[in-house]
């Protein structure tokens, strides 16, 4: 291509006023551009425009120059140049809007950040491409955990294009940010809207899961049960999520006077005591049975739990404490003390309340340390 450049330059120098020189100038700009020499390409096209302003080649050069400036992400410079040579009519505001966005999007898509998109949003407050520009700003900022920047960008998309192609993902991310910021009322309303609008299964599930967690946090137990039932009917539910949802529903049942429903969920969860939900459920099931005077059943539940074992020492210790209550209830205080003393001697050092619970119980049984 270097030989081509030499030839075109020579042609322009030897026949500066000919049609061949004008066409050579266009070819020179194209060769430079195709070989990544954008500054040289700009200079070549500008030379054609300035030397032969009324020619057809000058009009073509303006159009080709546009592509070079878009590639350089320098549409402002393109507009300024056209103004300087009296050709601003060839780049109306609507076209500059489009070109500026194209250049900014290209920069973003090639991994060079969102600065150009942010500049576009500032320069064109009524621009035709504010929706995608804000979406990409939000997406990149969310990935970088810059939630303060991502939230208004996603909010703009959701507010100004509620049914557009970017709306669902923008709403999903907006809700996630609101949840992370503990703005639960706004997040719940957003998740509820997302549940209705979502066409992507993952987004619908995320919406329901968000609603479940917020409802549980706010002790809205009826809502917890309703949303949990919807989630549990889904086919694509990971084992971990299924356990979390079952546990939340059991807790809601228990707090609304539906103990047997809660016990059913705890019983299901207690089959896997490797998980925190399973271990806690095994204990809660036994405690529920004990409180309802099903002492033998509670003992059986505890023995099953103890035999299975669990990595969650706290709930295993609570099971031993409850076992001591069972022995005490039967009048077997010596056995109860043995359980408690053994637990005290073997429970790993911890900042939880197990040791204080043991000491309190031993004191009640008439033995102090």
Model-derived regions: residue spans:
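Acidic, polar-rich low-complexity tracts and alpha-helical solenoid repeat scaffolds
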Residues: 1-369
């Amino acid at each position: 291509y270097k030989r081509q450049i030499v030839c075109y330059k020579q042609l322009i120098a030897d026949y500066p006023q000919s049609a061949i020189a004008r066409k050579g100038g266009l070819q020179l700009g194209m060769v430079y551009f195709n070989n990544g020499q954008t500054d040289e390409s700009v200079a070549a096209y500008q030379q054609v425009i300035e030397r032969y302003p009324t020619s057809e080649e000058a009009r073509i050069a303006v159009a080709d120059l546009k592509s070079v400036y878009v590639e350089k992400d320098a549409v402002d410079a393109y507009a300024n140049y056209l103004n300087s040579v009296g050709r601003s009519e060839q780049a109306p505001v609507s076209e500059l809007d489009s070109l500026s966005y194209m250049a900014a999007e290209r920069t973003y898509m090639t991994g060079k950040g969102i600065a150009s998109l942010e500049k576009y949003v500032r320069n064109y407050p009524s621009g035709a491409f504010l929706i995608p520009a804000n979406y990409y700003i939000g997406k990149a900022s969310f990935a970088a955990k810059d939630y303060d920047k991502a939230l208004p960008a996603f909010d703009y998309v959701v507010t100004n294009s509620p049914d557009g192609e970017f709306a669902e993902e923008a709403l999903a991310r907006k809700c996630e940010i609101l949840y992370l910021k503990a703005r639960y009322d706004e997040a719940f309303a957003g998740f509820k809207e997302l549940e209705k609008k979502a066409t992507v299964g993952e987004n619908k599930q995320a919406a329901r899961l968000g609603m479940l967690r917020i409802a549980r946090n706010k002790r809205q137990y009826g809502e917890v049960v309703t949303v949990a039932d919807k989630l549990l009917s889904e086919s694509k539910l990971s084992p971990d999520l299924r356990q979390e949802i079952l546990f939340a529903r059991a807790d809601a049942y228990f707090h609304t006077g539906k103990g047997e429903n809660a016990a059913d969920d705890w019983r299901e969860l207690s089959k896997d005591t490797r998980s925190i939900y399973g271990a806690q459920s095994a204990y809660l099931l036994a405690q529920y049975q004990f409180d309802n005077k099903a002492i033998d059943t509670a003992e059986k539940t505890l023995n099953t739990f103890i035999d299975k074992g669990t990595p969650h020492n706290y709930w295993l210790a609570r099971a031993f404490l409850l076992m001591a209550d069972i022995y005490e209830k039967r009048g077997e205080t010596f056995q109860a003390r043995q359980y408690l003393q053994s637990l005290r001697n073997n429970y790993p050092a911890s900042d939880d309340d197990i040791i204080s619970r043991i000491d309190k119980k031993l004191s009640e049984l008439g033995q102090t340390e």
